[in-house]
Amino acid sequence: CAKLGREFIRVQINPETDEDDLLGGFRLINGETVFAKGPVLKAMENGAILLLDEIDRATNKIMCLQGILEGKPVLVKKTGEVIKPADGFNVIATANTKGKGSDDGRFTAASIIDEAFLERFTVSVDQKFPSINIEKKILLKHMDKYIPSNATGDFTADELAQNLVTWADVIRRTFYDDGIDEVVSTR
């Protein structure tokens, strides 16, 4: 979004997220009760990219998004206003379980999302871990937060990053071979 100059709106989803959180609701502002548009309506009006982060943490309280995911206008029941999506409006979502829930105990807060809801996302990408070289570049980009550039010690930032990605690769391969129950991410 930054490279394209596009507005980006992120909504962190949790089990309590509902229509009021997403579309908006009545709020007391300066002593008056007014309808305040939520992040979804703002994104629709501005043609923004809307990220529904960790959508598999949601419950059926998010079904108000079904028509929106199809690119249709939405009737705001609380005001009677119809909001049409502006050009460029897109919705993306992240989910550790692709909305299928987690039986292995790794994502205990993940919910099973209604299949009809999931089908409204026309593209699904299974994000793999980056290659060792890419992951090392990611770590080096953020290394100064953890190791000052003038620090002295047993490892240079480059050596530490290489050791971390090598260790992560061993952990991941062991995980995929069912040797351990946990895996590490780049985070």
Residue ranges and their predicted role:
Residues C1-R187:
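C-terminal regulatory/interaction module of P-loop NTP-utilizing enzymes
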